[in-house]
Amino acid sequence: MPQLNTTVWPTIITSMLLTLFLLMQLKTLNMYYHPPASPKLMNIKPHNNPWEHKWTKIYSLHSLPLQS
């Protein structure tokens, strides 16, 4: 039975890996990657809330005097 010639295998494997690497590089070169998101500048209008102009006091139950 003849023996299998394996002397060219490293060359074949190296060329295969190089070809796969180049094909993947060409494939990813054609892809479009979105640029990173940047914060959007927004004009914030001040809200006109009626309770901001009034003085209000919130009473908690613990601060009220005891009723007997």
Curated annotation (Swiss-Prot):
The modification N6-acetyllysine is found at residues 54, 57. The keyword Mitochondrion applies. It holds the Pfam family ATP-synt_8. The modification N6-succinyllysine is found at residue 54. It is a single-pass membrane protein. Component of the ATP synthase complex composed at least of ATP5F1A/subunit alpha, ATP5F1B/subunit beta, ATP5MC1/subunit c (homooctomer), MT-ATP6/subunit a, MT-ATP8/subunit 8, ATP5ME/subunit e, ATP5MF/subunit f, ATP5MG/subunit g, ATP5MK/subunit k, ATP5MJ/subunit j, ATP5F1C/subunit gamma, ATP5F1D/subunit delta, ATP5F1E/subunit epsilon, ATP5PF/subunit F6, ATP5PB/subunit b, ATP5PD/subunit d, ATP5PO/subunit OSCP. This is ATP synthase F(0) complex subunit 8. It comes from Symphalangus syndactylus.
